[in-house]
Swiss-Prot record:
Enzyme Commission numbers on file: 2.7.11.-, 2.7.4.-
Domain notes: The Walker A ATP-binding motif also binds Pi and PPi.
PANTHER family linked to this entry: HPR KINASE_PHOSPHORYLASE (PTHR30305:SF1), PROTEIN YJDM-RELATED (PTHR30305)
Cofactor: Mg(2+)
Catalytic reaction annotation: [HPr protein]-L-serine + ATP = [HPr protein]-O-phospho-L-serine + ADP + H(+); [HPr protein]-O-phospho-L-serine + phosphate + H(+) = [HPr protein]-L-serine + diphosphate
Keyword flag Repeat: no
Leftover remarks: Both phosphorylation and phosphorolysis are carried out by the same active site and suggest a common mechanism for both reactions.
UniProt binding sites for Mg(2+): S160, E202
Positions with a binding annotation for ATP: G153, D154, S155, G156, I157, G158, K159, S160
Quaternary structure and interacting proteins, as annotated: Homohexamer.
Protein name: HPr kinase/phosphorylase
Keywords: ATP-binding, Carbohydrate metabolism, Kinase, Magnesium, Metal-binding, Multifunctional enzyme, Nucleotide-binding, Serine/threonine-protein kinase, Transferase
Active site: H138, K159, D177, R243
Amino acid sequence: MSVKVKDLLQKVRLQLIYGSEDLLEKEITTSDISRPGLEMTGYFDYYTPERIQLIGMKEWSYLMKMTSHNRHQVLLKMFQPTTPVVIIARDLEIPDEMMQAAQEKQIVILRSHTSTSRLSGEISSYLDSRLAERTSIHGVLMDIYGMGVLIQGDSGIGKSETGLELVKRGHRLVADDRVDIFAKDEMTLWGEPAEILRHLLEIRGVGIIDVMSLYGASAVKDSSQVQIAVYLENYDVNKTFDRLGNASDELEIAGVRIPRVRIPVKTGRNISVVIEAAAMNYRAKEMGFDATKIFEERLTNLISQNEVKHD
């Protein structure tokens, strides 16, 4: 996986100081960012030129204390063929020697008005999401009440139709059929559509529909955190389904576990409403309100009261 410098330039809203169109095609292969402090002093052991080189106030102030010759020599050594881009934070002035070294070594120079630490965070967050390894999952990803719900189930059970009904009820489609999921960190999953399927839903008997064209921009979303999975399966009278909500079921994707709810599909059952309820119930649990525990406590108290009466 890699990200082109031109994509970083657009997404993080940076200013291009030096770099041709060809140089903007350079690829960034790591989300790690280098703050070249010791390198300014001439110590290049363990230098990582393949990383983005971010220069903030500390690095810049030290650089400006050098003589013009030393400044030029240090920058020439810092700018390597594998260096994708050098970024200057805080709208700091670009010294002539840096422009000269960039021209000699053909290195892209970008600048931002943002503070160094905040800029570093923005770049890392963007690159982490773009460079993370993707896992393709069959299903429908919806944004329901601000929560990412992954709808799965056997082929033909009605996942896309349920997604369409949820869109009509005011929720947003993220992806249909193929959901590309990646771990943004050790605890968080994010999902997005395959580019060719963006905003599209396949409905049997109707064909492919463009949700954005039919229902507007408010009906779609480019990406979403995946917080809960819903698995649709055919109703089986011989199978026991969870009725209290205390059965623990999880789905693991890319090393991250999320809760999963299994919903039996039966003629006449409004699945979209059930999924809405599952999403709201998940949010309530996250806020510390668990209806199952409340019911169990009430039941325990009732049993205790009955035992006292019989005694």
